[in-house]
């Protein structure tokens, strides 16, 4: 959609070679300012056709987040309703099939055109709101440049060695097995499942007679904090072994998740979330690279 009131909706399958080149040049032109909702995702989609998008002056997703960071949902229809008081009909309301789209369903295309118009209207509204909140400079000088930096980071990925990850997985599995054996030896019973909170309660509070921890729905707490307090109080080797087992298993699980996330290019392509936390920091998902425990030497 253009500020002049023109809209165009098309599928790339309808473009002839000349049109495709022209569209690619228009998308890449930094002098032509563009507003999008979720520019990072759009850039990923366009990159699949070797297109680059330049001149993005407003990402309404990011702008809405800066104004109301505590919201749980920033999809386009919710953002339009939140900031403009307009309820848009979903483009796929009525569960349109690919056949409907292929048959040029007018309602579907009109809905997409309407949404394109509202991207521009929303961008204008959010520009005023950013000014009112004193966040215009933050938006243009930090958040908007960061959008495409994150897109490139996600696209390029993080190079890893699958062999090294498999070696780590094996090492942590062996550490966990060793800790499990030490736990069994310390109480003279190799039938106890130290991964079972219920069986841990029986060993700690009934068999070893330790003071009971905080009451829970399933008995008494056996979380890490509770076990560490018991270890400080009693110093029993069973507790040390259980804590060591848990630490090793957590690292093994983390490494297994990383192995599963490695792509054919031997890189991990995580998603960096710019609009999730209320504090403004980045988060990472699929996989969560911020969930790697680094407080211990093994974690590091």
Where in the sequence are the language-model features?
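Conserved DEDDh/DEDDy metal-dependent 3′-5′ exonuclease domain
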Residues: 1-131, 169
């Amino acid at each position: 959609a253009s500020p002049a009131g023109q809209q165009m909706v098309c599928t790339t399958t309808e473009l002839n070679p000349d049109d495709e080149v022209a569209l690619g040049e228009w998308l890449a032109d930094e002098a032509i300012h563009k507003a999008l909702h979720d520019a990072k995702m759009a850039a990923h989609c366009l990159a699949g056709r070797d297109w680059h998008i330049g001149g993005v002056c407003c990402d309404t997703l990011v702008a809405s987040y800066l104004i109301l960071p505590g919201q749980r949902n920033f999809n386009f229809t919710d953002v339009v309703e939140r900031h403009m008081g307009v309820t848009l009909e979903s483009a796929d309301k009525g569960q349109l099939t690919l056949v409907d789209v292929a048959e040029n369903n007018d309602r579907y295309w009109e809905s997409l055109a309407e949404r394109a118009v509202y991207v521009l209207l929303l961008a204008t509204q959010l520009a005023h709101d950013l000014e009112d909140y004193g966040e215009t400079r933050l938006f243009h000088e930090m958040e908007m440049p960061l959008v495409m930096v994150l897109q490139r980071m996600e696209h390029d990925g993080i190079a890893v060695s699958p062999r090294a990850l498999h070696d780590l997985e094996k090492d942590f599995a062996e550490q966990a097995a060793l800790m499990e054996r030490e736990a069994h030896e310390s109480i003279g019973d190799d039938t106890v499942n130290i991964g079972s909170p219920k069986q841990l309660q029986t060993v700690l509070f009934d068999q070893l007679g330790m003071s009971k921890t905080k009451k829970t729905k399933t008995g008494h707490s056996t979380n890490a904090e509770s076990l560490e307090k018991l270890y400080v109080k009693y110093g029993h080797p069973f507790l040390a072994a259980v804590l060591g087992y848990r630490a090793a298993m957590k690292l093994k699980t983390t490494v297994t998740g990383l192995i599963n996330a490695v792509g054919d290019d031997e890189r991990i392509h995580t998603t960096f979330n710019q609009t999730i936390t209320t504090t403004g920091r980045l988060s990472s998902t699929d996989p969560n690279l911020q969930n790697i425990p680094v407080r211990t030497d093994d974690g590091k």
